[in-house]
Structure formats: C-alpha cells, structure tokens
Amino acid sequence: MKTIYLAAAMASALSLSTPATAGFFDLTLAPFIGASAGQASYDLSCPATSTCDDSDTAWKIYGGLEVNEYIAMEVGYADLGEAKFSGTPSGTAEVNGMTVQLVGSFAINPSFSLIGRGGMNFLNLEKNGTIAGTPHNNEGDTDVAWSLGLGAQYNLSKSVGLRAEWERYFKVGDEDTTGEIDVDLISASVVYTFR
C-alpha cells in the first residue's frame, strides 16, 4: 500500500512540475541577427608623463540561434575602438575580434526581458607607441578573453527588439607581450528574430 501511495505522490509531483519546466525544454530554434553601437572604456595604466583618453565609440554585429525562450547562442564581430595617450610616450591601444557567447533571457512580461550573457571571445589587442617620434612597444596579440554582461530587451513586435547592455571583457591581450587589460562596453542594439 505504501508503494502505491508513493507512486501516486511521485506522479502528482511530476504532473505539477511539467507546466513549469515545459517552457525550458520547448525548443524554438529561431535564428536572429543584430547590430549595436555604444562606448567602450579601457582599464589602462596611464604613464605619469602622458595624458590618456581611455574611451571610444564601439560597435558589434552578431547573429545566432534562439534555442528556446530562455537560452540563445550568439556569434559576432566586435570593434571596441581605441584608447589614446599623448605625451611621452604617446600611442594607441585598440581591440577587435570575434565574440562567442551564451545569452540567457528572463521575460518579465511579453514585451520586456532581462538579459545575462557570458562567453569566450577571440580578441586582438594592438598597441602602437612612440617616444620622441621613435616607435616604442609596438605589439599585437590575439588571445581568448572571457566576458560577462547584463542588460534588458524591449520587444517592439514578435520579431524586432531593442537592447541596452553592459559587458566586460576580461584580460584582453597577453600578459608577456602586450599586457592584459579589461574593457567595458555600454551599448544599444537592434535585434531581428526570424519567427
């Protein structure tokens, strides 16, 4: 008799949990594309004899696959602008490359969602400097840089959405050649999902 009661209880629990979990396993497989623009800020150590401008205009283009209403896979290209320093030494540091990220979404209502993202990115850090007109520490390196981000999306329609996001790319560059820097990106984007 206890076995019957236990089986009945388990069946009831499964039937109650099914509506809550069905959405997560309900695949939509909807492709999407998007473009964003914003401002990147470089976490640089500015030499005492130089003046640094550590922010610049940045942009991204991306595409991916919405697996279900909660998870999407995204691949893109990011140009994070460049930081400039003038004085002694003077020069630039710029970052660009390929982004590979997993995007999570949680709908507050049909029009508004919160977004979280993380990924493994293949970014190139290029540093070019001069001292008294002579090239100095001109180095470049492409390496893996991890990233995290938070944001929100407002849906104008079933297919078109607007996003506002903050992202941080950690340890861009190589510690032994270019040195490593963190880059923050604040951006707004338009995304189109093929539904």
What are these regions (language model features)?
Residues 23-25, 29-30, 34-43, 59-133, ...:
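Gram-negative (and chloroplast) outer-membrane scaffold detector with strong preference
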